[in-house]
């Protein structure tokens, strides 16, 4: 247990440092979008650690600025998805009946399509842009939380303390807010963390396909797409943004996995009680 605490603490500290570096990237690197055509496709050097792109822009600056935008969007998307999924999953799991059947039907429809294809279809209908990206990924993301919350609520609502609360005349709304939702928080936290990394990759994938954040706003997927054209002349245009993206997503996933392991024993104890 002590080793797990130490490992989780290290993961958390490094994660916070990485996030702070991204958050303040605009102050650290304030000129990421400035064009310097005379310096285009320069190899990594002391002046440009990641080299420059085809327009002479510093790749280190653009990569960190792009990561900041992707992480901010991922956080917004997951907060919206979590709020919607928690409400829908709680109502479906607690009340059952028509609400639950309707939820299951919608869930089956949404999950029958690959998420990337569904996202492309929504963006094709709504148009590209940051707002559309948030709408499209949120409309698809809530199902993950709703399914998790519903499964937890189905178990919790049959517990003795919920039955006892009902017997003293407590309203369904009170029970949901006071007793059910607080007991769903633990499994949701690691899921939320893992989905942040998943969403960052989804944003980058859509950007690579040309359906994500549009230029001149820096975005990792679009930067990698631009680098494909110059892969033989300037491989650093793909190597450094792709590597940094992988490192951030890997660290988020490691933190999410460790949080899931951390909360699992607590969940088992609570259920046994």
Q: Where is each model-derived feature located?
A:
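Short helix-to-coil transition segments within interhelical loops
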Residues: 52-57, 94-95, 110, 164-183, ...
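Generic hydrophobic transmembrane alpha-helix motif, especially the helices
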Residues: 49, 53, 59, 93-94, ...
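N-terminal signal-anchor/first transmembrane alpha helix
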Residues: 1-30, 106, 185
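Transmembrane-helix boundary motif in ABC transporter permease subunits
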Residues: 26-27, 74-107, 120
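C-terminal transmembrane helix and the adjacent membrane-cytosol boundary/short C-terminal tail
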Residues: 140, 186, 192-196, 235-273
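Periplasmic/extracellular loop-to-transmembrane helix junction in inner-membrane transport proteins
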Residues: 1, 34-77, 226-242
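Glycine-rich helix-loop "coupling/hinge" segments at transmembrane-helix boundaries
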Residues: 123-125, 152-153, 202-244
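Membrane-cytosol interface at the C-terminal ends of specific transmembrane alpha-helices
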Residues: 78-79, 86, 90, 128-178, ...
């Amino acid at each position: 247990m002590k080793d797990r605490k130490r490992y989780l603490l290290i993961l958390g500290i490094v994660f916070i440092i990485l996030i702070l570096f991204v958050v303040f990237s605009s102050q650290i690197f304030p000129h990421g979008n400035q064009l310097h055509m005379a310096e285009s496709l320069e190899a990594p050097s002391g002046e440009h650690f990641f080299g420059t792109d085809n327009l002479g822009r510093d790749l280190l600056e653009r990569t960190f600025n792009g990561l900041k935008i992707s992480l901010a969007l991922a956080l917004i998307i997951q907060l919206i998805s979590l709020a919607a999924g928690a409400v829908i999953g709680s109502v479906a799991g607690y009340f059952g009946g028509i609400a639950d059947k309707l939820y299951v039907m919608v869930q089956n429809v949404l999950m029958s399509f690959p998420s990337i294809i569904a996202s492309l279809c929504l963006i094709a209908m709504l148009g590209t842009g940051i707002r559309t990206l948030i709408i499209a990924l949120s409309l698809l993301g809530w199902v993950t939380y709703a399914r998790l919350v519903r499964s937890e609520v189905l178990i919790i609502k049959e517990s003795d303390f919920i039955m006892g609360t009902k017997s003293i005349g407590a309203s369904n709304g009170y029970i949901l807010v006071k007793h059910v939702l607080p007991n769903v928080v633990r499994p949701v936290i690691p899921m939320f963390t893992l989905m942040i990394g998943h969403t960052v990759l989804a944003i980058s994938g859509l950007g690579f396909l040309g359906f994500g954040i549009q230029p001149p706003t820096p975005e990792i997927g679009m930067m990698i797409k631009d680098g494909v054209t110059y892969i033989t002349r300037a491989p650093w245009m793909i190597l450094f943004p792709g590597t940094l993206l992988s490192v951030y997503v890997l660290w988020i996933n490691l933190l999410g996995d460790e949080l899931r392991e951390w909360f699992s024993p607590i969940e088992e104890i609570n259920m046994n009680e």
